[in-house]
Curated annotation (Swiss-Prot):
Gene name per UniProt: mggS
Organism placement in taxonomy: Bacteria, Thermotogati, Thermotogota, Thermotogae, Petrotogales
InterPro entries in alphabetical order: Glyco_trans_1 (IPR001296)
Classification via Pfam families: Glycos_transf_1
Species per Swiss-Prot/TrEMBL record: Petrotoga mobilis (strain DSM 10674 / SJ95)
Cofactor: a divalent metal cation
Signal peptide residue numbers: none
Identification of the protein by name: Mannosylglucosylglycerate synthase
Record flagged with keyword Glycosyltransferase: yes
GO biological process: lipopolysaccharide biosynthetic process
Function, in words: Involved in the biosynthesis of the compatible solute mannosylglucosylglycerate through a nonphosphorylating pathway. Catalyzes the synthesis of mannosylglucosylglycerate (MGG) from glucosylglycerate (GG) and GDP-mannose.
Amino acid sequence: MEIGLVHYRVGETDGVSLEMVKWKQALRNMHLKTYLIAGDMGTSPGFKIPYIAYTDKRSNILKQKSFVNLDEWDENYFKKEMNKYIEDIYNQLYEMMDLDVMIVNNIFSLAHNPAAAVAIYRFCKDNGIKMIGHHHDFYWERDFYKNPTNDYIKEILEEYFPPKDITHVVINSLAQEELKNKKGLDSIVIPNVFDFNQKRWEIDDYNIKIYDKLNISQKDLIFLQATRIVRRKAIELAIDTVAEVKKDLKKYIGKTTFNGKKITQDTNVFLVLPGLSEESDYVEVLKEYASQKDVELKLAFSISDDIRHEEEEIFSLWDFYAIADFITYPSILEGFGNQFLEAIFAKTPVLMFEYPVYKKDIAPLGFEVVSLGSKAEYERGMYRVNQNEIIKAKEEIFQILFDPQGLHRLSRRILNLGKNIFPMKLWRKS
């Protein structure tokens, strides 16, 4: 049996790309031939379909015409352009003809590229390829997609997002309920999983160079924000919390952290962001806000990738986890939470906002985190939580930083929970 995993991109550090690699490995462990298919392959081997890349010009034009404004186009012209794009994508799929199964990641659910959804569905139908829709996010969850501009795009959303006659997989129980309520479709829940048996992420002779690359002392404290840089990640909440930590750090001069860093007059605190920067205006907002709050941001995407490239001094995302003292994960909305699983494996304490899926599917399992609560307001382009939550989180962070035995017990218990609840072998049971 030959299986294709398709998405707009792979070989990056975003959640869908990372999860596709896990599925590929799990399927190959079951002795199934498995291939990655994407518009942009990043560092991964596989089949490239350029027309479905996030950066494709026609994709972005039609996305704007579909959900923002038709402008000078009328509906007939829109339909003509959309159909031509569908045909072009269809024709690029010819190398996939021998597949038995196509696992379609987010293309049938998020509506970033409606033409890709139609083309892939028709191609699979025409060639007898079974389809599994792996839905990480739904278009109705995002404000951008809530106002289609014409009847043709409404028809496409109704028929192909997602198609009714395929197998559906979602990554949390809230998504399962929504898909049933909105579309009348049943689905299987397979949460994000993780290979807890892989080699530990530890500081070594290579990743220790990150300190010099970012002009950080090995004695400084590093808070790691490992997500992409987009608004729903609410990185401003990490800035708020780090600002409070930095403000009170001098009270702890002379103390030693759980990982052996002695706090001195010169100890600094950094918020390091190695993730993809996908909203340039938001990056500027964060820079300005961090400056106001006296927090030093280190944007590290230029030296980060999904795997190491030692000849170019590029580090993997896991290298950044190895040097982190604390993980920040204040996302307002997540399909599941890859960074949460990564923090568990890294045995690094995590600060997080309790987004809906975390509250529903993860928190009841017994994980312990430093919480920013579950209520946030969006005002003037940024998310806010009650200042009392920030102060409470700061106090818990200091308690963890200077209690090595307590952290050891906590991280060991949480790691064991993670191994038992979200292992790669969960795949075989689903």
